[in-house]
Amino acid sequence: MADTTHLNGLESCFQRGNLTLKVPMSLFQNNRKRLVARINSNTKVPTTGTFIILEGGVEIPFNDTDICWPFRQESFFQWCFAVEEPGCYGALDLATGTSILFMPRLPPEYAIWEGKLHSLDDFKKRYAVDETYYTDEIAKVLKSKQANLLLTLNGQNSDSGLQAKEATFDGINQFKVDNKTLYPEICE
């Protein structure tokens, strides 16, 4: 798992070990800001009530065992949020630029294997996002923010020919979903 340490005591960083470069979280904040600005200037979607929704990667079981392949984050989600944990979602409010990270709600028993379970505030600081909630609250949080339109990924990678995984979550059917706008803009 990558470390997110503080660079000179001031800023969190993404790092894959002591002998690798430290990437400041401000890079990912800037990526998010540029994406929001690009969507707002290059498309005709309304800014008010529109949110970009990205789904992070999930763990993949190793055949029929109770272990998983080493986890690798979904590329677009990594580019926006630099999150190392599986099963997360991210949202960006086109009107305000607010970044929201949704983390899985883990049962207390996980601490037996995983060690101390981090709080939402821990994740907010670690990943330099504006707000954090649990993944079982996505629809409720978006409703509270008067979300009308969700921009989701849907497109084919021009190099691999593989299809991007479109975000889905419980309650997504309560919102209008546009899966055409985001992919060409995030790829630029």
Segments and roles (model prediction):
Residues 1-188:
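A composition/biophysics-driven feature that prefers long, compositionally simple stretches
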